[in-house]
């Protein structure tokens, strides 16, 4: 965000929607004077708005920026969630829709018959995940309507910053636009 956008410019007023806000980002963005910052989550006490990502209580084309990191892998109907994200994003708006991804997989794997937490952890990487995304994730976002840039920032920043920010080497981040 710092390198590629005007997100941190005080003159650039942005309406931001942040799903399942991470503590470190929450504090930073809440104090950012140029941001009209709204957090949402179905369960988190940090959330300004308690909402289901598949049925958002916001008007169409409302947000300049949407941050949704490591949420979609928990959502049974991720297509509906992606459609809702697209709906509330303004034309020209930016969405960071990061997920855990297995780039060795061509296609996403989901199986809703797997309900045992230990089995989910083994297969999907965490007990409350309902799928493991493959390389087709970016195309799924495109099929919703997003323009997607696939960014590997770990190849563009110093190794010590990769370590500092706990980035996974080679992780591809979808930078999406409407």
Q: Predicted regions span which residues?
A:
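Class I SAM-dependent methyltransferase SAM/SAH-binding core
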Residues: 8-55
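Short amphipathic alpha-helical segments and helix-helix/interface helices
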Residues: 6-7, 26-30, 82, 135-138
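S-adenosyl-L-methionine-dependent methyltransferase catalytic module, highlighting the catalytic core
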Residues: 76-85, 90-178
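Cys/His-rich short segments
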Residues: 1
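Short boundary motifs at domain starts and secondary-structure transition points
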Residues: 5-10, 164-165
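A short acidic, Gly/Pro-enriched loop at the edge of an enzyme's catalytic core
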Residues: 53-66
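A short SAM/SAH-binding and catalytic strip from SAM-dependent methyltransferases
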Residues: 64-76
């Amino acid at each position: 965000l710092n390198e590629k956008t005007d997100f941190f410019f005080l003159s650039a007023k942005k309406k931001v929607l942040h799903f399942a806000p991470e503590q470190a980002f929450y504090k930073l963005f809440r104090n950012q004077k140029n941001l009209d910052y709204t957090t949402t989550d179905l369960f988190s006490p940090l959330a300004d708005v308690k909402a289901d990502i598949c049925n958002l209580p916001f008007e169409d084309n409302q947000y300049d920026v949407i941050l949704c990191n490591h949420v979609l892998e928990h959502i049974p109907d991720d297509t509906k969630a992606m459609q809702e994200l697209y709906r509330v994003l303004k034309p020209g708006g930016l969405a960071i829709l990061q997920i855990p991804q297995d780039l060795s997989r061509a296609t996403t794997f989901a199986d809703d018959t797997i309900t045992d937490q230990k089995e989910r952890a083994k297969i999907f990487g965490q007990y409350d995940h309902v799928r493991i995304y493959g390389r087709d994730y970016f195309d799924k976002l495109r099929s919703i309507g997003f323009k997607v840039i696939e960014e590997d920032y770990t190849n563009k920043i110093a190794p010590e910053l990769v370590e500092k920010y706990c980035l996974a080497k080679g992780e591809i981040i979808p930078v999406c636009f409407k």
